[in-house]
C-alpha cells in the first residue's frame, strides 16, 4: 500500500488555512499580512481537492489566529477552514462565519468619507446580497463590493 504524500509540508505548531478557493491564497497573504509575523509560511496554490476541484492552502508556523481574525477571513474565503495545529495534530477546526461588522481593517474607498483619510477607526457593516459580499461604510453609508474596499 502506498503511503499518502503531502503536497505541502506538515507543521508542528501553528495555523493551517485550508480549503481556500484556488487563486485566493495570495490575496489572503496580502490582506492579512501573514508574512509579517516573521515565522515560516508555506503556501500551496491550485492543489487537488476532492470537494472543490482545486484549492489553495496556507500554513503559518508558530502563529495561532484568534476567532476574530479567522472570521475576517470569511470575507475572502467563506468556505475556508482554519485549523489550529499542535504537535503535528489538528487540535481545533474552525469553520468560518461572516462577521456582521468589521473594524480597523479596510479604508473606505470614498475619498470624501471620514473613514478614508481621517484618524478614525474604519467600520463597515457586512451583508450578503445576491451571493456577493457587500460592505457598508459606517460613516458615509455607501455600500461597496468586497474587492473595492480591499483595494482602497
From Swiss-Prot:
GO terms for biological process: 'de novo' pyrimidine nucleobase biosynthetic process; pyrimidine nucleotide biosynthetic process. Pfam families: PyrI (PF01948), PyrI_C (PF02748). Its cofactor is Zn(2+). Zn(2+) binds at residues 108, 113, 137, 140. Binds 1 zinc ion per subunit. Keywords: Metal-binding, Pyrimidine biosynthesis, Zinc. GO terms for cellular component: aspartate carbamoyltransferase complex. It comes from the Bacteria. GO terms for molecular function: metal ion binding. The keyword Zinc applies. Gene3D superfamilies: Aspartate carbamoyltransferase regulatory subunit, C-terminal domain (2.30.30.20), Aspartate carbamoyltransferase regulatory subunit, N-terminal domain (3.30.70.140). InterPro entries: Asp_carbamoyltransf_reg_N, Asp_carbamoylTrfase_reg, Asp_carbamoyltrfase_reg_C, Asp_carbatrfase_reg_C_sf, Asp_carbatrfase_reg_N_sf. Contains catalytic and regulatory chains. HAMAP family: Asp_carb_tr_reg (MF_00002). Belongs to the PyrI family. Involved in allosteric regulation of aspartate carbamoyltransferase. This is Aspartate carbamoyltransferase regulatory chain.
Amino acid at each position: 500500500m502506498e503511503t499518502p504524500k503531502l503536497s505541502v509540508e506538515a507543521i508542528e505548531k501553528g495555523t493551517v488555512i485550508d480549503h481556500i478557493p484556488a487563486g485566493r491564497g495570495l490575496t489572503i497573504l496580502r490582506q492579512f499580512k501573514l508574512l509579517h509575523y516573521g515565522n515560516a509560511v508555506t503556501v500551496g496554490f491550485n492543489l487537488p481537492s476532492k470537494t472543490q476541484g482545486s484549492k489553495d492552502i496556507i500554513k503559518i508556523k508558530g502563529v495561532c489566529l484568534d476567532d476574530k481574525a479567522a472570521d475576517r477571513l470569511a470575507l475572502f474565503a467563506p468556505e475556508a477552514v482554519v485549523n489550529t495545529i499542535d504537535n503535528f495534530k489538528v487540535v481545533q477546526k474552525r469553520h468560518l462565519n461572516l462577521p456582521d461588522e468589521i473594524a480597523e481593517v479596510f479604508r473606505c474607498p470614498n475619498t470624501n468619507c471620514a473613514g478614508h483619510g481621517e484618524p478614525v477607526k474604519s467600520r463597515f457593516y457586512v451583508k450578503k446580497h445576491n451571493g456577493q459580499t457587500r460592505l457598508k461604510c459606517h460613516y458615509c453609508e455607501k455600500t461597496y463590493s468586497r474587492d473595492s474596499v480591499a483595494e482602497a
